[in-house]
Amino acid sequence: MAKSQNKESPELRTPNRFITDHDASGLSVFNTSIPDALPAQVIGGRDRFHLAYATTTSPVDLTNQSDIVTYSSFLSTPPGIFLPGGSVLRIVDVRPGGESLMHRTESIDYGVVLDGEIDLVLDSGESRILKRGDVAVQRGTNHLWRNRSHTAWGRMVFVTLEAKPIEIDGKLLGGVTGLGMDDTSPAGN
């Protein structure tokens, strides 16, 4: 099978997503109702989001392809960073030297670096360097992501889940705007 490349970042191939399913007899098969290649959503004219999957309930209803129908609807109108009561699986391509704005969402985000080195910077000034295979558990904190390379794209995969509002010393923190992604909202659609 030929390697499918992104025109804007030839070092990163276009990611594929393979969905398993059941045939009429209950045998495990691959679902072919949605193309495998993940389309890219350009964010703020810069970085790219690839929506790999999304659900709107927990537990997820897998009967009669309910979850696949839900996900399919999000391909034309991508969700926000997280979906209330559901989950979002997203691959994020960060341009060379790219940096998000400082932001907070009412979510828990599991992020794994797939390519490159990415800084996770907190509003306290603390930061960590994430290398390929490293995991960040982002728990509703005010943070930004930065690609350390000025010549190569970075890639991360995220699973985001809604979280309860954070309360510190009797004060609700809430979500913070300033995602730096004009075409993406923190929650929902």
Swiss-Prot record:
<dbReference type="InterPro" id="IPR047142">
    <property type="entry name" value="OryJ/VirC-like"/>
</dbReference>
<dbReference type="InterPro" id="IPR014710">
    <property type="entry name" value="RmlC-like_jellyroll"/>
</dbReference>
<dbReference type="Pfam" id="PF07883">
    <property type="entry name" value="Cupin_2"/>
</dbReference>
<dbReference type="InterPro" id="IPR011051">
    <property type="entry name" value="RmlC_Cupin_sf"/>
</dbReference>
<protein>
    <recommendedName>
        <fullName>Phomopsin biosynthesis cluster protein D</fullName>
    </recommendedName>
</protein>
<comment type="similarity">
    <text>Belongs to the oryJ family.</text>
</comment>
<keyword id="KW-0843">Virulence</keyword>
<comment type="function">
    <text>Part of the gene cluster that mediates the biosynthesis of the phomopsins, a group of hexapeptide mycotoxins which infects lupins and causes lupinosis disease in livestock. The role of phomC within the phomopsins biosynthesis pathway has still to be determined. The pathway starts with the processing of the precursor phomA by several endopeptidases including kexin proteases as well as the cluster-specific S41 family peptidase phomP1 and the oligopeptidase phomG to produce 10 identical copies of the hexapeptide Tyr-Val-Ile-Pro-Ile-Asp.</text>
</comment>
<dbReference type="InterPro" id="IPR013096">
    <property type="entry name" value="Cupin_2"/>
</dbReference>
